[in-house]
Amino acid sequence: MYPANQSFLVLGLSRSGRAAAEFLLSKNAEVYLYDDMETERVEKELDRLSAQGGKRVDKEALAQMPEKCDVLVLSPGIPIDHPLAVAFRRNRRAVIGESELAARFIRCPIIAVTGTNGKTTTVSMLAEVLQKSGFQVQACGNIGTPLIEYCDMPTESFAVAEISSFQLETLNSLCPHIAVILNVTEDHLNRHYNMENYIFLKAKLLKNLTESEYAVLNYDDKTVRAFAEKTKAKIVYFSVRERIKGAYYENGNLYYLDEKILSVAELPSEGLHNVQNALAVIAAAKLVGVSSKDIAKALSSFKGIKHRIEKVATVDGVTYIDDSKGTNVDATIKAVETMKTDTVLLLGGKNKGYDYGTLFAALNVSKVKHAVLYGENRYALLKAARECSFDSVTLCDEFSFAVRIAAMRAEVGQTVLLSPASASFDQFASYEERGDKFAEIVATLAKEKEENREAAEPEEDTDETTDEGMDESIGEQLDERKDETAELFSNDGIFDSRTEETE
């Protein structure tokens, strides 16, 4: 591909769209720009890229682009069956994404990581292991910084790239030195329509691998294990269930080819899913040539990532955990499994096409004692809860209100867990924004409680605002919402009778 000889339409000016446009402009390509979000941020980006030589396209001119442009660069948030993408393909024009563009130009070897859950943690962990072992490395891709920004990295360095199913829709040229597939469970069915399509996309990461490359696969996941038949690459498995030729977990220790790397007690994050992530990292790091000592040292000091089972605060004996990155059922179940105390769970957001019955079946045998259902999909969650006889729930629409309800319901020694099993896009721009809002509300609650205590100290007879007063105010609002919801759902015990006055 010679960008200077071609014209491109960049559709969508998200992080990857902006990066793709900047790269193409730096190569003297003819670049057209369009984003249908008429926000201040988009306008600033259009102005900035136009100053570099980009050409703004208005909505009326879009229909001409499939004939005018050679290539459509599609942002990951825009599906491959978007009408404009369909029109480009009908005109025998290429439809690619930023990651595909990067794959055609990047010089350094890539370690690519995909899977339904654990991608960001694994990429961050692996990048840290390599960096602390003396390698020049960049964590990139879906984790935040677009892969295209590292096309000029020297050949002796590594790009550790998180690759999502959205990116795989338009990714055809990537041939990573090591491809890691962590797991495949139900996700993004509102985008990919069915599991067959989703599985096909995950397997695409392996399609260009030769006998010179490696595929690190989860032996315990039958779908992922079967991918071994779809590639020519050398296979290295990891497992938490069986002693295999690869990375495995046995009797509280993590091994690679029968050599102990470290004990599970040395891992800073709890949960079997984190053991799986660490095993995948061990396998990939060993293939690069990192010593067992360096791997163990880096893994034991890894601090984790934001919004993934992250402790926010403890307020009046209640612990608040941010797992806003838990955007699907499997991720939420894994987060719940790590809870050591009785838990109030915050669920809800934008539906991604899940069967929530699996979730509530798991909650019935977990530490979760109450669930606050909020957001766009709250009624779908409520329906699944009823069908699974999970009756201790509260229903509301707004996220901020839901967090306060959860705080009110939690008792000393319990945990409030935000792990929504849903996308954030009904009320937020991203799961990061949702998690930050959660932390902000918790901080506000802590401040309010402290102010109430201070106000109560000088005079015992003052007409003060207490925690109980705040609870009563919330309770009055809950009563109104309960009456509204009860009209839709008959009195079958869906509301917890223990808190009748506050719901």
What are these regions (language model features)?
Residues V31-D35, Q138-A139, V160, Y237, ...:
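Short beta-strand "acidic-cap" motif of Rossmann-like dinucleotide-binding folds
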Residues K59-E60, I96-E100, K232-Y249, A296-S300, ...:
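Beta-strand->loop->alpha-helix junctions that form or flank phosphate-binding loops
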Residues S7, L25-S26, A63-C69, P76-Y219, ...:
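Phosphate-binding loop of NTP-binding sites
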Residues Y2-S7, G17-K27, V264-V368:
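Nucleotide phosphate-binding/pyrophosphate-handling subdomain across enzymes
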Residues E45-R48, G357-Q414:
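C-terminal helical cap/extension that packs against the catalytic core
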Residues E30-M37, A215-Y219, L346-L347, K367-E376:
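Short internal beta-strands
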Residues M1-A112, L126, S300, R308-E310, ...:
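Short, basic phosphate-binding NTP loop
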